[in-house]
Curated annotation (Swiss-Prot):
SUPFAM superfamilies: S-adenosyl-L-methionine-dependent methyltransferases. It is an enzyme of class 2 (transferase). Pfam families: MTS, PrmC_N. This is Release factor glutamine methyltransferase. The gene is prmC. Gene3D superfamilies: DNA helicase RuvA subunit, C-terminal domain (1.10.8.10), Vaccinia Virus protein VP39 (3.40.50.150). The keyword Membrane does not apply. Keywords: Methyltransferase, S-adenosyl-L-methionine, Transferase.
Length: 294
Protein backbone atom coordinates (compact mmCIF):
# COMPACT_ATOMS: atom_id res chain seq x y z
CA UNK A 1 0.00 0.00 0.00
CA UNK A 2 1.53 3.35 -1.04
CA UNK A 3 2.44 5.77 1.72
CA UNK A 4 0.37 8.94 2.20
CA UNK A 5 2.03 11.97 0.65
CA UNK A 6 3.68 14.22 3.22
CA UNK A 7 2.33 17.73 2.74
CA UNK A 8 4.10 20.90 3.78
CA UNK A 9 2.15 23.94 4.91
CA UNK A 10 2.91 25.89 1.74
CA UNK A 11 2.05 23.00 -0.59
CA UNK A 12 -1.24 22.36 1.14
CA UNK A 13 -2.18 26.03 1.14
CA UNK A 14 -1.42 26.43 -2.56
CA UNK A 15 -3.40 23.33 -3.50
CA UNK A 16 -6.36 24.18 -1.27
CA UNK A 17 -6.60 27.79 -2.43
CA UNK A 18 -6.73 26.64 -6.06
CA UNK A 19 -9.31 23.95 -5.21
CA UNK A 20 -11.55 26.38 -3.31
CA UNK A 21 -11.31 28.89 -6.16
CA UNK A 22 -12.32 26.20 -8.65
CA UNK A 23 -15.33 25.33 -6.46
CA UNK A 24 -16.35 29.03 -6.27
CA UNK A 25 -15.78 29.26 -2.51
CA UNK A 26 -15.82 32.89 -1.34
CA UNK A 27 -12.39 34.22 -0.34
CA UNK A 28 -10.53 30.97 -1.10
CA UNK A 29 -7.20 32.16 0.34
CA UNK A 30 -8.73 33.37 3.60
CA UNK A 31 -10.71 30.14 3.95
CA UNK A 32 -7.66 27.96 3.40
CA UNK A 33 -5.47 30.00 5.76
CA UNK A 34 -8.03 30.13 8.57
CA UNK A 35 -8.82 26.43 8.36
CA UNK A 36 -5.19 25.32 8.26
CA UNK A 37 -4.26 27.76 11.01
CA UNK A 38 -7.11 26.39 13.11
CA UNK A 39 -5.98 22.80 12.65
CA UNK A 40 -2.32 23.58 13.39
CA UNK A 41 -2.94 26.13 16.13
CA UNK A 42 -1.11 28.82 14.17
CA UNK A 43 -1.94 32.42 13.24
CA UNK A 44 -2.16 33.17 9.53
CA UNK A 45 1.24 34.91 9.47
CA UNK A 46 2.83 31.95 11.23
CA UNK A 47 1.74 29.66 8.40
CA UNK A 48 4.09 31.50 6.07
CA UNK A 49 6.89 31.79 8.60
CA UNK A 50 6.72 28.02 9.10
CA UNK A 51 5.84 27.22 5.48
CA UNK A 52 8.03 24.11 5.18
CA UNK A 53 6.52 22.44 8.25
CA UNK A 54 5.20 18.95 7.36
CA UNK A 55 1.72 17.93 8.49
CA UNK A 56 1.13 14.74 10.41
CA UNK A 57 -1.47 12.32 9.11
CA UNK A 58 -3.79 13.30 11.98
CA UNK A 59 -3.45 16.99 11.11
CA UNK A 60 -4.06 16.27 7.43
CA UNK A 61 -7.26 14.34 8.20
CA UNK A 62 -8.50 17.13 10.46
CA UNK A 63 -7.83 19.68 7.72
CA UNK A 64 -9.64 17.59 5.13
CA UNK A 65 -12.65 17.31 7.43
CA UNK A 66 -12.69 21.09 7.88
CA UNK A 67 -12.47 21.59 4.12
CA UNK A 68 -15.43 19.26 3.58
CA UNK A 69 -17.49 21.42 5.93
CA UNK A 70 -16.48 24.52 4.00
CA UNK A 71 -17.47 22.91 0.71
CA UNK A 72 -20.90 22.22 2.21
CA UNK A 73 -21.31 25.95 2.79
CA UNK A 74 -20.57 26.29 6.50
CA UNK A 75 -18.80 29.62 7.09
CA UNK A 76 -15.09 29.26 7.73
CA UNK A 77 -15.35 31.35 10.90
CA UNK A 78 -17.77 28.86 12.44
CA UNK A 79 -15.61 25.90 11.43
CA UNK A 80 -12.53 27.50 12.95
CA UNK A 81 -14.48 28.95 15.86
CA UNK A 82 -12.85 32.33 15.41
CA UNK A 83 -13.20 35.62 13.60
CA UNK A 84 -11.14 38.78 13.60
CA UNK A 85 -12.55 42.23 14.28
CA UNK A 86 -10.51 45.43 14.46
CA UNK A 87 -7.38 43.30 14.74
CA UNK A 88 -8.67 41.28 17.70
CA UNK A 89 -9.57 37.60 17.70
CA UNK A 90 -13.05 36.54 18.82
CA UNK A 91 -14.67 33.18 19.40
CA UNK A 92 -17.78 32.72 17.23
CA UNK A 93 -20.28 29.97 16.60
CA UNK A 94 -23.81 29.74 15.21
CA UNK A 95 -25.22 31.57 18.24
CA UNK A 96 -23.83 34.89 16.99
CA UNK A 97 -23.28 36.80 13.78
CA UNK A 98 -19.88 36.71 12.15
CA UNK A 99 -18.29 40.19 12.56
CA UNK A 100 -18.08 42.12 9.28
CA UNK A 101 -15.45 44.62 8.08
CA UNK A 102 -18.21 47.21 7.57
CA UNK A 103 -18.95 47.12 11.28
CA UNK A 104 -15.31 48.02 11.96
CA UNK A 105 -15.91 51.24 10.03
CA UNK A 106 -19.01 52.00 12.09
CA UNK A 107 -17.06 51.38 15.29
CA UNK A 108 -14.27 53.67 14.14
CA UNK A 109 -16.81 56.35 13.28
CA UNK A 110 -18.38 56.00 16.74
CA UNK A 111 -14.99 56.44 18.41
CA UNK A 112 -14.26 59.50 16.27
CA UNK A 113 -17.59 61.06 17.25
CA UNK A 114 -16.92 60.29 20.90
CA UNK A 115 -13.48 61.90 20.65
CA UNK A 116 -14.91 64.96 18.88
CA UNK A 117 -17.39 65.40 21.71
CA UNK A 118 -14.56 65.30 24.24
CA UNK A 119 -16.24 62.47 26.10
CA UNK A 120 -13.58 59.89 25.30
CA UNK A 121 -11.16 61.83 27.48
CA UNK A 122 -13.45 61.62 30.50
CA UNK A 123 -12.16 59.58 33.41
CA UNK A 124 -14.51 56.73 32.55
CA UNK A 125 -16.84 57.22 29.57
CA UNK A 126 -19.99 55.15 29.86
CA UNK A 127 -20.93 53.13 26.77
CA UNK A 128 -23.96 51.03 25.78
CA UNK A 129 -23.76 48.43 23.01
CA UNK A 130 -27.25 47.31 21.93
CA UNK A 131 -27.38 43.88 20.28
CA UNK A 132 -23.87 42.93 21.33
CA UNK A 133 -23.82 39.42 19.80
CA UNK A 134 -20.26 38.11 20.05
CA UNK A 135 -19.34 41.21 22.03
CA UNK A 136 -16.93 42.41 19.35
CA UNK A 137 -18.02 46.06 19.54
CA UNK A 138 -18.28 46.25 23.34
CA UNK A 139 -14.99 44.44 23.91
CA UNK A 140 -13.09 46.43 21.29
CA UNK A 141 -14.33 49.66 22.88
CA UNK A 142 -13.20 48.42 26.29
CA UNK A 143 -9.78 47.59 24.86
CA UNK A 144 -9.38 50.85 22.95
CA UNK A 145 -10.71 53.03 25.78
CA UNK A 146 -9.15 51.55 28.93
CA UNK A 147 -11.13 53.80 31.26
CA UNK A 148 -14.49 53.04 29.69
CA UNK A 149 -17.35 51.36 31.51
CA UNK A 150 -19.38 49.31 29.03
CA UNK A 151 -22.86 47.81 29.15
CA UNK A 152 -23.51 45.13 26.52
CA UNK A 153 -27.15 44.20 25.93
CA UNK A 154 -28.70 41.43 23.88
CA UNK A 155 -32.06 39.65 23.80
CA UNK A 156 -30.29 36.30 23.30
CA UNK A 157 -28.92 34.54 26.37
CA UNK A 158 -26.91 32.30 24.03
CA UNK A 159 -25.24 35.30 22.41
CA UNK A 160 -24.40 36.75 25.82
CA UNK A 161 -22.67 33.49 26.75
CA UNK A 162 -20.42 33.92 23.71
CA UNK A 163 -19.80 37.58 24.53
CA UNK A 164 -18.83 36.75 28.12
CA UNK A 165 -16.40 34.12 26.87
CA UNK A 166 -14.78 36.70 24.60
CA UNK A 167 -14.62 39.30 27.36
CA UNK A 168 -12.87 36.78 29.59
CA UNK A 169 -10.39 35.96 26.82
CA UNK A 170 -9.52 39.64 26.39
CA UNK A 171 -9.32 40.39 30.10
CA UNK A 172 -12.07 43.02 30.16
CA UNK A 173 -14.87 41.15 31.97
CA UNK A 174 -14.66 43.41 35.01
CA UNK A 175 -15.40 46.50 32.91
CA UNK A 176 -18.33 45.11 30.91
CA UNK A 177 -21.79 44.56 32.35
CA UNK A 178 -23.83 42.08 30.32
CA UNK A 179 -27.60 42.53 30.29
CA UNK A 180 -30.23 40.25 28.76
CA UNK A 181 -32.78 42.73 27.44
CA UNK A 182 -34.99 43.26 24.39
CA UNK A 183 -34.51 46.62 22.68
CA UNK A 184 -38.12 46.43 21.46
CA UNK A 185 -39.45 46.21 25.02
CA UNK A 186 -40.82 49.23 26.88
CA UNK A 187 -38.70 48.15 29.85
CA UNK A 188 -35.43 48.23 27.91
CA UNK A 189 -34.23 51.59 29.27
CA UNK A 190 -34.83 50.47 32.85
CA UNK A 191 -32.97 47.22 32.19
CA UNK A 192 -29.79 48.81 30.83
CA UNK A 193 -29.63 51.87 33.08
CA UNK A 194 -27.55 54.87 32.14
CA UNK A 195 -26.91 57.64 31.44
CA UNK A 196 -24.37 56.90 28.71
CA UNK A 197 -21.86 58.94 26.74
CA UNK A 198 -22.13 56.63 23.71
CA UNK A 199 -24.88 54.32 22.52
CA UNK A 200 -23.78 52.15 19.60
CA UNK A 201 -25.85 49.49 17.88
CA UNK A 202 -25.71 47.13 14.93
CA UNK A 203 -29.36 46.08 15.14
CA UNK A 204 -31.31 43.58 13.02
CA UNK A 205 -32.02 45.62 9.87
CA UNK A 206 -32.70 43.13 7.07
CA UNK A 207 -36.39 43.39 6.09
CA UNK A 208 -38.31 40.12 6.05
CA UNK A 209 -38.89 40.66 2.33
CA UNK A 210 -35.12 40.52 1.67
CA UNK A 211 -34.39 37.36 3.66
CA UNK A 212 -34.64 35.07 0.63
CA UNK A 213 -32.13 37.20 -1.29
CA UNK A 214 -29.29 36.73 1.22
CA UNK A 215 -26.43 34.30 0.60
CA UNK A 216 -27.46 30.73 1.28
CA UNK A 217 -24.73 30.23 3.88
CA UNK A 218 -25.99 33.27 5.79
CA UNK A 219 -29.55 31.95 5.77
CA UNK A 220 -28.49 28.43 6.72
CA UNK A 221 -26.02 29.19 9.48
CA UNK A 222 -26.21 32.69 10.94
CA UNK A 223 -28.86 33.55 13.58
CA UNK A 224 -31.95 35.00 11.91
CA UNK A 225 -32.86 36.75 15.17
CA UNK A 226 -29.78 38.96 14.85
CA UNK A 227 -30.39 39.83 11.21
CA UNK A 228 -34.07 40.33 10.45
CA UNK A 229 -36.82 42.73 11.47
CA UNK A 230 -40.27 42.90 9.82
CA UNK A 231 -39.63 46.15 7.93
CA UNK A 232 -35.98 46.57 8.92
CA UNK A 233 -36.65 49.70 10.99
CA UNK A 234 -38.31 48.45 14.17
CA UNK A 235 -35.12 48.42 16.25
CA UNK A 236 -34.02 51.86 15.05
CA UNK A 237 -37.39 53.29 16.04
CA UNK A 238 -37.37 51.69 19.48
CA UNK A 239 -33.79 52.72 20.23
CA UNK A 240 -34.39 56.26 18.92
CA UNK A 241 -37.33 56.60 21.31
CA UNK A 242 -35.33 55.30 24.29
CA UNK A 243 -32.04 57.06 23.50
CA UNK A 244 -32.90 60.57 24.78
CA UNK A 245 -33.40 59.13 28.26
CA UNK A 246 -30.34 56.88 27.97
CA UNK A 247 -27.80 59.44 26.73
CA UNK A 248 -26.30 62.40 28.52
CA UNK A 249 -26.69 65.76 26.82
CA UNK A 250 -24.08 65.76 24.07
CA UNK A 251 -23.90 61.97 24.15
CA UNK A 252 -23.38 60.14 20.86
CA UNK A 253 -25.81 57.74 19.19
CA UNK A 254 -24.31 55.59 16.43
CA UNK A 255 -26.07 52.98 14.29
CA UNK A 256 -24.95 50.57 11.61
CA UNK A 257 -27.33 50.95 8.65
CA UNK A 258 -28.90 48.99 5.86
CA UNK A 259 -27.49 50.51 2.67
CA UNK A 260 -30.93 51.98 1.86
CA UNK A 261 -31.83 53.01 5.39
CA UNK A 262 -30.23 56.39 6.08
CA UNK A 263 -33.15 58.63 5.15
CA UNK A 264 -35.71 56.62 7.11
CA UNK A 265 -33.51 56.36 10.21
CA UNK A 266 -32.83 60.09 10.06
CA UNK A 267 -36.60 60.68 10.04
CA UNK A 268 -37.05 58.42 13.08
CA UNK A 269 -34.66 60.52 15.16
CA UNK A 270 -37.05 63.45 15.45
CA UNK A 271 -35.95 66.64 17.19
CA UNK A 272 -34.05 65.07 20.08
CA UNK A 273 -30.77 64.83 18.17
CA UNK A 274 -28.42 67.20 16.35
CA UNK A 275 -25.42 67.02 14.02
CA UNK A 276 -26.58 63.93 12.13
CA UNK A 277 -23.78 62.40 10.06
CA UNK A 278 -23.93 59.49 7.62
CA UNK A 279 -20.74 57.53 6.85
CA UNK A 280 -20.12 55.26 3.90
CA UNK A 281 -18.41 51.89 3.61
CA UNK A 282 -15.70 50.66 1.25
CA UNK A 283 -18.27 50.40 -1.57
CA UNK A 284 -19.49 53.98 -1.09
CA UNK A 285 -22.76 52.74 0.39
CA UNK A 286 -24.34 54.37 3.42
CA UNK A 287 -23.32 52.17 6.36
CA UNK A 288 -23.41 54.20 9.56
CA UNK A 289 -25.33 57.09 11.07
CA UNK A 290 -24.39 59.11 14.13
CA UNK A 291 -25.84 62.08 15.99
CA UNK A 292 -25.68 63.87 19.32
CA UNK A 293 -28.33 64.07 22.03
CA UNK A 294 -29.59 67.60 22.66
Amino acid sequence: MPEEKVWSVVELLKTTIAFFAEKKIDEPRLSAELLLGHVLGLQRLQLYLDHERPLTLKELEAFRAACRERLQGRPVQYIAGEAFFYGYQFFVDERVLIPRPETELVLEHAMERLAASGLDSADSPSILDVGTGSGCIAITLALRLPGARVTAADVSADALDVARRNADAHGVSERIRFVEADALSASFADAVGGPFDLLVSNPPYIPEAEWATLQEEVRRYEPRLALVAPTGFEYYQSIAVAAPSLLRKGGVLCFELHADGAAEVRNLLGSSFADVQVMQDYNKLDRGLSCMAQ
